[in-house]
Design a protein with these regions (language model features):
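Structural recognition of the beta-strand scaffold that forms the well-ordered cores
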Residues: 170-171, 177-180, 238, 265-269, ...
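Conserved, mostly hydrophobic/aromatic
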Residues: 90, 169, 257, 305, ...
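Alpha-amylase-like alpha-glycosidases and glucanotransferases acting on alpha-linked glucans and related
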Residues: 338-383, 418-458, 520-541
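Aromatic-lined carbohydrate-recognition surfaces of secreted/lumenal glycan-active proteins
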Residues: 237-243, 268-270, 310-323, 387-388, ...
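Generic recognition of stable, solvent-exposed alpha-helical segments in well-folded globular domains
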Residues: 164, 213-217, 221, 245-252, ...
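Catalytic and substrate-binding clefts that recognize carbohydrates or anionic sugar/phosphate headgroups
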Residues: 1-234, 241-243, 247-249, 254-259, ...
Length: 664
């Protein structure tokens, strides 16, 4: 502690400097000003007070801070050691204080990454990132007409920072990381060079600090902290999962796709529960059990597919349609979250229909959902996997059984939802055989969710909501401990004339083949959009790349084993293995494990693209041509996206076999 202040040092480098005449910590009070429309939020804050803490004392290693005009408002600060690193604990007992602001220091050339699953920017410098789980929006670029239209239609345009999975954790190029252990709304502000601004809507905050000799070891430390995922099942990585939602015609179409020679290990029918038609498109009937009218023979179809090595996957989310039977069951058992102004169940508007919220703070309700719905209606029925959708919509004016503040429960909800799903699988002893995938997340979801998907991209090449965002999402989420990531092949959102093109389908097929899981989706408006079976060319291309994906399975299995041991993600930024500032901004290509670089075409109209190769000798997967370090212009025809493998890889035999089977 210095006279009139204190410094927080990391390896003799100052991270936080607080002085009476230049306070780095402020406290205050505020009232949230929020509006939610179907998971899209307008977030404002009415700040009623903001006080710099200009008085300092220390008693028994506890620093006390206050403002000279309000000495009764005291903030205590303690530095403790944890198994993972150091923890800076800030507390203010004043009941009216609910805001904290801190300004930490950094070097002017320090780079930052993380923030959960970020769609627009891998490197966070120069921008402000609120952490609040929500719909990411459609368009996500305030300069575009689509975003402006969606904003006008229900706050649904989004922005560069909106994401299903925020996490207040960031990594530094100086090989340290910071995590805010809070579920409250918080903000990372990197708009001012040399400063790291933190805002937290709570008077209680733990700032966890991590250090490591390398960036890879830092990622391992974060994975140790937040939890590891189990290995993906063999069937999930050994072929494509075909998504169809065409009711009685699904199996006919599936057999056509299967007869193309595609390597298929899964059939995913999210409409297994039935359909509800809305102006947005085909929606599902949210009563989570087999709909015999939609799929009359599904109970016989599932074992028949299994005999061919094809698993069946479905869909579930944490809400119950008010006109469904399971809603009535939950209501009868008092398992639903309530309104604040009455004991009536809270009804959430999901766009032309309402649904109830199962209260996962009620342990009996959480167990009921795990056992009664996922266990009995899904796993026992024969499902091997599912999309565990949503988790971002918890209203902030809801009443929960545990009495928790919904402003904080909101961010915790995806984690509770993930645990409900994981518990169901564990209860059947199928943790290594069944799987589910989620788009929503927050700190701690890593311990429960085995597989992320990138959410609802637009079916286009746009900068902030198109195919390219899938790569950024995989890389950013991987840095904070999520080893497995994939996307909806073809994209999802088709609105206001935005529809899939043949070029987009071909490029997404190429991209999906080089992810741990290759899964297609028909999108929100299947009839308006190209599908896998819409043309012989698309189907043949899908069949080819599904076989490439299947042939890569031994390599993916090795990466999965590495992920279990170290927490390293399968898709990695180049800088994770080659710590060079020249690579800190790269977000349109990635290392697939240490031995492969994948550079998909994610811009419209390209027939080639620039690929940055780090040091070493790199073999072009399709031709065998050897390239060295540097930037190379590489041809990128459909079916041969720019992919390179390390010449000295222990997997060279496998890579050579792929070239012999699919190369030119």
């Amino acid at each position: 502690m210095q006279t009139g202040g204190f410094d927080l040092l990391r390896d003799d480098v100052c991270m936080l400097s607080h002085r009476s005449d230049k306070p780095a910590i402020e406290v205050g009070s505020g009232t949230p000003d929020l509006e939610m429309v179907r998971g899209n939020f307008r977030i404002g804050d009415v700040v009623e007070s903001r006080l710099p803490l200009d008085c300092i004392s220390e008693i028994n290693d506890v620093i006390r801070l206050w403002n000279k005009a309000q000495p009764e408002l005291v903030v205590t600060l303690e530095l403790e050691q944890s198994v993972h690193g150091s923890v800076l604990k800030l507390r203010c007992a004043n009941p009216t204080t609910n805001r904290l602001w801190l300004t930490m220091q950094c070097s002017t050339n320090e780079a930052f990454w993380g923030g959960g699953e970020q769609m627009s920017y891998l490197k966070l410098n120069g921008r402000r990132f609120p952490f609040w789980t929500s719909e990411p929006g459609v368009g996500r670029d305030k300069t575009t007409r689509l975003t402006q239209t969606m904003d006008a239609e229900g706050l649904a345009g989004g922005d560069y920072w909106t994401t299903n999975y925020p996490q207040p954790t960031w990594l530094s190029s100086e090989r340290h990381a910071v995590h805010l252990e809070t579920a409250a709304y918080s903000v990372l502000d990197l708009t001012e060079q040399g400063k790291v601004g933190i805002e937290c809507w709570s008077a209680k905050l733990d700032i966890e600090l991590f250090d490591a000799p390398s960036l890879r070891e830092l990622v391992t430390n974060l994975s140790d902290r937040f939890g590891r995922q189990p290995p993906l099942p063999d069937w999930a990585i050994s072929g494509a999962i075909v998504g169809l939602k065409d009711g009685a015609d699904t199996l006919t179409r599936f057999e056509k796709i299967a007869s193309s020679g595609a390597a298929i290990t899964g059939l995913w029918c999210e409409d297994w529960v039935g359909i509800r038609q809305t102006s947005f498109g085909k929606r599902l009937f949210w009563d989570w059990k087999w709909n015999a009218a939609r799929y009359p023979d599904l109970h016989a179809t599932i074992p028949s597919l299994a005999a061919r090595g094809i698993r069946f996957l479905g869909y579930v989310n944490p809400y119950l349609a008010v006109d469904g039977a399971l809603y009535q069951e939950a209501l009868a058992n008092s398992y639903l979250a309530l309104r604040q102004d009455s004991d009536a169940p809270y009804a959430v508007d999901f766009g032309e229909f309402d649904a109830g919220v199962v209260d996962f703070t009620n342990l009996d309700a959480a167990h009921w959902f795990s056992e009664r719905i996922i266990g009995r209606e899904m796993l026992d029925f024969g499902l091997s996997g599912w999309m565990a959708d949503f988790g971002e919509y918890l209203p902030t004016d809801i009443r929960l059984l545990d009495g928790s503040d919904p402003m904080e429960a909101h961010n915790r909800w995806p984690v509770l939802w993930a645990k409900v799903n994981a518990d169901a699988i564990a209860s059947r002893g199928k943790t290594h055989d069944a799987t589910f995938f989620m788009r929503a997340g927050f700190s701690g979801v890593q311990a429960h969710c085995p597989l992320l998907w990138a959410g609802d991209q637009c079916v286009d090449f746009t900068r902030h909501d198109g195919i390219n965002t899938v790569i950024t999402a995989a890389l950013s989420s991987g840095l904070v401990g999520n080893a497995y990531h994939h996307s909806d092949l073809g994209g999802y959102t088709s609105l206001h004339g935005v529809v899939r093109t043949s070029e987009l389908m071909h490029r997404w097929i190429d991209l999906a083949a080089f992810a741990p899981v290759m899964r297609s989706h028909e999108g929100n408006r299947p009839a308006d959009n190209l599908q896998l079976d819409s043309s012989p060319e698309i189907l043949a291309h899908f069949a080819r790349m599904s076989r490439v994906h299947a042939q890569l399975a031994p390599y993916v299995r090795a990466l999965s084993e590495e992920a279990v041991a170290t927490g390293l993600p399968l898709q990695r930024p180049v800088f994770l293995h080659y710590d060079d500032p020249a690579y800190y901004d790269i977000q349109d290509q990635y290392l697939y494990g240490a031995d492969m670089i994948v550079a998909p075409v994610v811009e419209q109209g390209q027939t080639s693209r620039l690929v940055i190769l780090p040091e070493g000798e790199w073999v072009h997967l399709w031709t065998g041509t050897v390239h060295g370090k540097g930037t190379h212009n590489v041809a990128a025809p459909h079916g041969q996206p720019p992919v390179f493998t390390r010449k000295d890889s222990t997997h060279t035999y496998l890579f050579t076999s792929i070239r012999q089977a699919f190369g030119s």
